Amino acid sequence: MAMNTLQKLCVVCSKCNECAMDVECLKYCDPNIVSMDSTAFRRNGVMVIHLYRTLYPALVSQNAVQTSVLTLYMEMLLQGLYDTMREIDMALTDFGTHRDRQRYYRRVLKLDSCNRHESITITFAPELALTIDLATLNDVERLLCKINCVYGAVDASQGVAVCRRLLSLLARLCDICPVAGPEIYRETVTCFQCYEELMAVPNQGRSINRRMQGLLCDHITIKKVLVQLDMDAQAVEQDMGDIAIRAPSVKGIIRAIKSLASFSPASYAYINDAEEALRGYNLFSEIPDRIYSLSDYTYWSKTSEAIVRHVGITMRQLNVSHSLWKTLRTELSRYHYGEDLEDVFTLGEGRFGGDERIYVGSIFAAPGKVVDMITSMSIKSFENNPLFNRLHESNEIYAKIKSLIEEIRGVGDGPAAGAARSRAEAASGAGAGGEEGAGAAAGRGNTGGDEGAGTTTAMSSALECGDPLLRVHDVNKEVNVRKRAYLKKVSEMGYNKVMACIRNQEHLVTKLVNVNLVGTVCLEAVSKIMNGFLSRQRSITEAETYPDVAESLGYDEHLYVINNLVHKRLPSELLPQLGQQIYRFINGPMFTHYLDRHPLPYNVNMAYACDNAGILPHVKEDLVRCADGTVVPSDWMTVGYMGFFRFADIRELNDLQKMVWAHIRELVLSVALYNETFGKQLALWRVEDGDEIGDGIILTYNPESPLILRRGDRSYRSRDLYLLLYKHLSVDSETLADAGSRASVADLCQVERPGPIAEQRSSTQNVKKKRKRMSLLELVRDVDGAGGDDLVPPCLYK
């Protein structure tokens, strides 16, 4: 089966990604080695130039009409590949002359300039313009969410220009490398996908801002664990093949790396021995005191291990491993090229020592191991805090476990030996004097006689004092029991808090240290917003070919429609549905969950847009009041003649937003009242609806031609809503009238009152109507009595 154009483009994108990754790695390689074997580089460069001259112009043309994440990304990638490969080629030519590696790296890595900042100015009105500074991927995503909320107030041409500048900034931030640099994103700033994920789970009574605090975003950049340290040495040994035989020193280095990676500390080996000793005991076994103590200490040691992660690599091992890998690289370089390798990571290598390797990083250390080491070092530093003395007892616990195991092995191991020993101890205790031995056996831990002697002395002293309460109650013993219980509870609570804190911080360190790939969130947002502005831009060109109803209609027709609507009232049961329509037209094109398989209502999409844009609560309240609407037309009919979507003398963005909301509310409610009054089914559409648009009024958001009336194969434009409604009446009358009597609405208004409806039916039997025939007199009369017996044009019931 032949591939379509989209599939072919995906294949080309995959190959370009592979080439981009190789070129990005080439930036950090020794230029002397690259110059020796540059055949593949130049061959790929020729292919990139060919794609740039043939495919790139087509992508730019496509993105000027309709965008997608793939076409936008391909445009960025081809432009970046072309510029990068040209820069590397010129830098290699320059290196052949001056032989200065540092100069080469500064040019290729662009260390002497910074082009990762952008200031964008958006003009909303002649006296209202805002400037936004951008420096990270998070800033781009947040700006697009804000533009989505003021979508109707931004000019279409300006919106497309802003999206193009944002795309250019994304290209500079990401370059051609799929791995995101740590300076181009902020992991603690959430995106709109983080918000949508939180909305899918119960909020448990917490606000969205509180739930998003401390949340790490894994959408703008996606965390990937790509390297496993334990597998590196084996994989390198397999790749080298015969080199290990011809270069004996290489084989010895690999053997040292393997032994270093497999090393694990032996200080906690007694835990395994303790578990083996405890495995022979069950619920029905007689448990000796030593076994009970061994189980108790093993439990506490595991509790400590739940907090302190004992990793298989220490700081010294990390430095030794880095040194061994560096030596291996040098040996391979001498074998292949006859000289030492000096890449960008070699510069300043001797300056780092101690724990600095963690913070600088190593190309030979797996990120997961570094994360474990940072966690372990943090816990060791935390253990030095005297407020948590329990953590200092870890070594004592292991020492006690060791001594118990040695005692058990000395007298015999297993349940049988333990039972015999227990019986012997019980017999000796009974023979020695009864109650003291029984008390020690019952106490499990009170194996010595000093505590019993001290308690007996205290009781005797209390009895001598004559306190009757102390004769039947040991207060000192109860105080000690309560004290131990309290300390245990506080200790458990402290451990839980420490574990939660460490777990959260470990997530942050993992996000920072591991490889993060650039996500598609920003490109998705740019594509949606840009497609909306492109649709509006196309509608401007198309509207110029449509007749303007203002050329044939005037202010009288405008007043005629208003006078027929202003005394009516909307049915209150329609307000919830109309409120949803208001939210639909106020919201931008970024959140379209009403098109999902399981669609969400328009108000939920609007809530997503407001929360991600950071709209203040009192502004949200104003929006809700606007969308709730009223049944009285005088409350929403505020737009003047020929003034729809024309905003003058606006100096505050909040005022501009409210005016946009008011215009959209008037559009939705006036059309609904028009349908109720005149018995029509006039629909409303957004300009972004595309092929789904049918007959009705199309909102373009453009001040030049904000409204377009489509009726069959004819379309009209206007800046006045009520002129379009009058035109719709006229077009409907022409459709229903006979072919020989196509009079205008104004002429039909002068016709005498027709006879009964029954006499009119004979002239309309051959006319196909969309709705059930009914008495139009009741439709057009003023039901509130304000209009008396006045009627609307007779054309409505012909």
From Swiss-Prot:
GO terms for biological process: viral DNA genome packaging. The keyword Iron does not apply. GO terms for cellular component: host cell nucleus. A zinc finger (C3H1-type) spans 191-219. One of its GO terms (molecular function) is ATP binding. ATP binds at residues 674-681. Residues 416-458 are annotated as: Disordered. Its main location: host cell. Keywords: ATP-binding, Host nucleus, Late protein, Metal-binding, Nucleotide-binding, Viral genome packaging, Viral release from host cell, Zinc, Zinc-finger. Disulfide bonds: none annotated. Signal peptide: none annotated. It is found in: Host nucleus. InterPro entries: UL28/UL56. The keyword Zinc-finger applies. Residues 416-429 have a biased composition (Low complexity). Residues 430-452 have a biased composition (Gly residues). Belongs to the herpesviridae TRM1 protein family. Component of the molecular motor that translocates viral genomic DNA in empty capsid during DNA packaging. Forms a tripartite terminase complex together with TRM2 and TRM3 in the host cytoplasm. Once the complex reaches the host nucleus, it interacts with the capsid portal vertex. This portal forms a ring in which genomic DNA is translocated into the capsid. TRM1 carries an endonuclease activity that plays an important role for the cleavage of concatemeric viral DNA into unit length genomes. Associates with TRM2 and TRM3 to form the tripartite terminase complex. Interacts with portal protein. This is Tripartite terminase subunit 1. It comes from Murid herpesvirus 1 (strain Smith) (MuHV-1). The gene is TRM1.
